[in-house]
Amino acid sequence: MGKRVSHNEGADRRPKKKAKNEKPEKETMESPAADVTVDFGSKSDATYVQSQVLSDMPQSEIDQFLATHSIKVTDTSDAPAVRPIISFSHLPSCDSKLYSSLSSFASPTPIQSATWPLLFAGRDVIGIAETGSGKTLAFGLPCLKKILDSGKIKFKNARPAAVIISPTRELAMQIYDQISKYAGSIGIKATCIFGGVKKDEQREALKSAAIVVATPGRLKDLQNDGSVDLGKVKYLVLDEADRMLDKGFEQDIKDIISSTPDSKRQTVMFTATWPPSVRDLAATFMTSAVTVTIGGDPSADPRANTRIKQTVEVVQSHDKEYRLVQLLSENQRGAAALDKVLVFCLYKKEAMRVERLLRNKNFKVAGIHGDLNQHERFKSLDAFKSGAATVLVATDVAARGLDIPSVKLVINVTFPLTVEDYVHRIGRTGRAGAEGRAITLFTETDKAQSGALINVLKAAKQEVPQELLKFGTTVKKKQHGAYGAFFKEADSGKSATKIVFDD
């Protein structure tokens, strides 16, 4: 028999103010001292049974796993602690068809290992991890198991059991593609809702969907016209929460959440960063949430994936496109001819010009930027994923969230507006444990970013070229000449402005 773990924190599980002598936050993931069986009260009926093999594992092995993968789990409640699910064999019992697709993976990723036991146990969870960390399956598997355990997998009247909110249509489609594979194997229907297409087919799909993956703007629209009722939602996910706030969707998110049942809802938030604006949002709708952090301090300076070899070349502005053609020619020949290369530009017009240039040079190229319609964007992404195009020219609309497998190289033709965007861009390579490469063409125009870039390079133990050091190591205030001090923490007391072009 395994250990049965769940939690009872009373009817009111809202965060409480810290008392003077309150004990400090505890880092969890040690094993409970004895078998514990407690129900969740009104919040959830979830019960998690920890595998006996996992329970018998020496604590030293658990500690080593947490340290090796830089996993920190912080829980301020008195709930029993649970151990990370290190192997798929440690998963709680469920329909074997749900787990069968996992055989293609060697083991859970760190974010999956740490969040699965908590989510299976019905806890509210905040996951802080880099993109490409396996978070879709981290929140997706517990979601599907929760629906299976409820005994109801057929739904009608547009009353879904689970809602997953994503900042962009591309990311929503990507999540849907992964979730639907697992859901379909056990007879659960999922649908994807986003802007830029007609609503009629979406309304029809909503009628029988158990899981809705959606962008906030379109979901809010369909709510307003009565096409979907969120009153039965028991599992709510906010993916890329920091990015949704950046894009001005805070009020839409709050409106959507307020229409779901607080007393029965399990809430999950995933974010790459942890600024005050995201913390404030979490505090308004999550109860006694456990925070799982993979890597360093998310509120500190941005850090690049250490598996990515970063190269910075200081060039003249007028030489950038010539150098880009050289780099592609050097990196797409012989055995590497089919390697996927992601090329980033700063503006739409620049991206369109670079795409035309590369096409004229006979590269197999596709593009993705804000001027393309829905069909054109999906067509470009599909071409790149399938290998029909080996070069994808993108603006920052593709910098975060998009899961494009096997990108070997990222080339930054123009440095982004912030070093955070730089880290997100190059994070398209070196995913799922693979090695990656990133080459950045840096010009005198970008010199205000030199100090921050040097810090990122040093933190990842990468070579810093002397030409870059000449621009200085001072970290400037986060602002851009054309946009001013646009990069400010969101004021949680003010309503955000919705940007509609990407939803």
UniProtKB/Swiss-Prot annotation:
Which residues of the sequence carry a binding annotation for ATP?
129-136
The UniProt entry, under SUPFAM superfamilies, shows: P-loop containing nucleoside triphosphate hydrolases (SSF52540)
Q: What does this protein do?
A: ATP-dependent RNA helicase required for 60S ribosomal subunit synthesis. Involved in efficient pre-rRNA processing, predominantly at site A3, which is necessary for the normal formation of 25S and 5.8S rRNAs.
Q: What is this protein called?
A: ATP-dependent RNA helicase dbp3
Keywords (alphabetical) are: ATP-binding, Helicase, Hydrolase, Nucleotide-binding, Nucleus, Ribosome biogenesis, RNA-binding, rRNA processing
Domain Helicase ATP-binding, chain residue ranges per copy: 116-292
Q: Can you supply a Gene Ontology BP term from the record?
A: endonucleolytic cleavage in ITS1 upstream of 5.8S rRNA from tricistronic rRNA transcript (SSU-rRNA, 5.8S rRNA, LSU-rRNA)
- State where composition is biased (Basic and acidic residues): 1-13
- The sequence motif named Q motif is recorded at 104-112
Positions of the UniProt region annotated as Disordered: 1-37
CDD domains given in the database record = DEADc (cd00268), SF2_C_DEAD (cd18787)
- Residue ranges for motif DEAD box? 239-242
InterPro entries in alphabetical order: DEAD/DEAH_box_helicase_dom, Helicase_ATP-bd, Helicase_C-like, P-loop_NTPase, RNA-helicase_DEAD-box_CS
Pfam families found in the cross-reference section: DEAD, Helicase_C
- What EC number(s) has UniProt assigned to this enzyme? 3.6.4.13
Spell out the family assignment given in the record's similarity comment.
Answer: Belongs to the DEAD box helicase family. DDX5/DBP2 subfamily.
Molecular functions per Gene Ontology: ATP binding; ATP hydrolysis activity; RNA binding; RNA helicase activity
Q: Cross-referenced PROSITE patterns, in alphabetical order?
A: DEAD_ATP_HELICASE, HELICASE_ATP_BIND_1, HELICASE_CTER
PANTHER family, per this entry?
Answer: ATP-DEPENDENT RNA HELICASE DBP3
Q: What is known of its domains?
A: The Q motif is unique to and characteristic of the DEAD box family of RNA helicases and controls ATP binding and hydrolysis.
User: Which residues does the UniProt record annotate as the domain Helicase C-terminal?
Assistant: 323-472
What is the organism field in this record? Aspergillus clavatus (strain ATCC 1007 / CBS 513.65 / DSM 816 / NCTC 3887 / NRRL 1 / QM 1276 / 107)
The reaction(s) this protein catalyses: ATP + H2O = ADP + phosphate + H(+)
Localization (cell): Nucleus, Nucleolus
Q: Which GO terms describe its cellular component?
A: nucleolus; preribosome, large subunit precursor
